[in-house]
Amino acid sequence: GGTDSYWTRDYGPWWVVDGNREIGIVDFTYNRPRPNDNDAPTKVSNYLDTPYFATDVITAGGNYMTDGYGISASTTLVYEENSMSNNQVHQEMLDYYGVHTYHTLEDPNDEYIDHIDCWGKFLSPQKVLIREVPTSHDQYEEIEEVADYFENIVNAYGEPWEIFRVYTP
């Protein structure tokens, strides 16, 4: 079936593997008024005859990154979009995505869509890419705080993250 937009990262399915190594699709409620986009994960699941699980979390894929080993991150927009408590959001992430460590950070860009993919990306279970701006940039301090945050936490292997910066003036 058709969709309403081309933002597949925002509304597409998230694949999970359970303890029996069985693959399924987890579907969040898409945070935009685009019903055909919101239905895309169900359509993919039906087409591929893949198990489907729906979570009550409202979000967009652009505000979610995961290392594939139980560590994920989003901006605090995920709390603002949901009527459930922050603890309930974390529990849904654990129950449906296997996320035992969920980092939720203030959006350092503080503009537009507040998606984490506007300034950060897990490149692997050990590497994270963070936006870098000149010291004269309005959000310089906030972006550096995010980089410092990741420099002071550990990855799934219990090691410091390897931080890569991309200059985006």
Residue ranges and their predicted role:
Residues 1-169:
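The feature marks the mature, well-folded catalytic cores of soluble enzymes
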